[in-house]
């Protein structure tokens, strides 16, 4: 998720005038595939890596807009640095590929990319099943979130993921409904 002022993507939430404010907690040291291969070469693997193996995990770390509202830039940076440090401590600095903070979208957030090494082997599956992801969220909240006054999200929530397109459509519908209601109120007042 690297981009500069000349980035031409399809995400309409990006404000290109704010893209120059994006920053790295740590930069990628080359192309991701080269960095991954270099890291894997340091391992003593017992088996060949499967062709369908997950070579990189990516997390998006952030909170809702209300959390960042009124927060100074240095406070936001401290929050994201603390989050990155948490992941480095948990999964190993040597496995980290990059951490970039985007401030050019609706809500600031960090993209963190790393090689999923567990017990000296490439294994995203053993690191990130449903239970371990829930535990990860709790640990992150306990070690970082509490410090910033965040509340732990609902555990075992039955909420389902919707696509970005579905979310955008929902926001457009809600906005149109609000405008309609406002017009109705103004019409009733006349």
Predicted segments, located by residue:
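N-terminal nicking endonuclease/strand-transfer module with a His-rich metal-binding environment
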Residues: 1-190
